[in-house]
């Protein structure tokens, strides 16, 4: 389980995730990197769910990005189609959050591609806590996108037993 949060604000998109990998009720690893850069550093991607499944999806998504010259929405839709129709992929238990200068998207195992209205993505076991925190901070403060992601992940880590305080954060200027 995990928490992934992404915020768009003040000309930046920032995505962060915690580092905990659990097997049942046991913490197996505390410093996993669940957020990374794809497609020549132009796309930020994070995952929630089964780690091995997520790595498979990262590979497939990066393949779609290459095939569609980095066009995020097209690559996401094509991955979702593949996920829905390929029997081996349909059993994967993970979700992806992806973002670049143009869009922020959630790609689910049901074949859904969702672009949130407010540029806020939160998913995983601590996603609801992080979403509530980030939403309040977006509405009531002038904090940077990075500060909001850090704070939301911290709050999720305080509440969710499957989320820790080790954070991996990637940031991209929207002008790039």
UniProtKB/Swiss-Prot annotation:
Allosterically activated by HslU binding. It holds the Pfam family Proteasome. GO terms for biological process: proteolysis involved in protein catabolic process. SUPFAM superfamilies: N-terminal nucleophile aminohydrolases (Ntn hydrolases). Keywords: Allosteric enzyme, Cytoplasm, Hydrolase, Metal-binding, Protease, Sodium, Stress response, Threonine protease. Na(+) binds at residues 157, 160, 163. Gene3D superfamilies: Glutamine Phosphoribosylpyrophosphate, subunit 1, domain 1. The active site is at residue 2. CDD domains: protease_HslV (cd01913). PROSITE patterns: PROTEASOME_BETA_2 (PS51476). Its EC number is 3.4.25.2. The keyword Protease applies. InterPro entries: ATP-dep_Prtase_HsIV_su, Ntn_hydrolases_N, Proteasome_sua/b, Proteasome_suB-type. GO terms for cellular component: HslUV protease complex; proteasome core complex. It catalyses: ATP-dependent cleavage of peptide bonds with broad specificity. It is an enzyme of class 3 (hydrolase). It is found in: Cytoplasm. GO terms for molecular function: metal ion binding; threonine-type endopeptidase activity. A double ring-shaped homohexamer of HslV is capped on each side by a ring-shaped HslU homohexamer. The assembly of the HslU/HslV complex is dependent on binding of ATP. Protease subunit of a proteasome-like degradation complex believed to be a general protein degrading machinery. Belongs to the peptidase T1B family. HslV subfamily. NCBIfam families: ATP_dep_HslV, PRK05456.1. This is ATP-dependent protease subunit HslV. It comes from Pseudomonas fluorescens (strain ATCC BAA-477 / NRRL B-23932 / Pf-5). The gene is hslV.
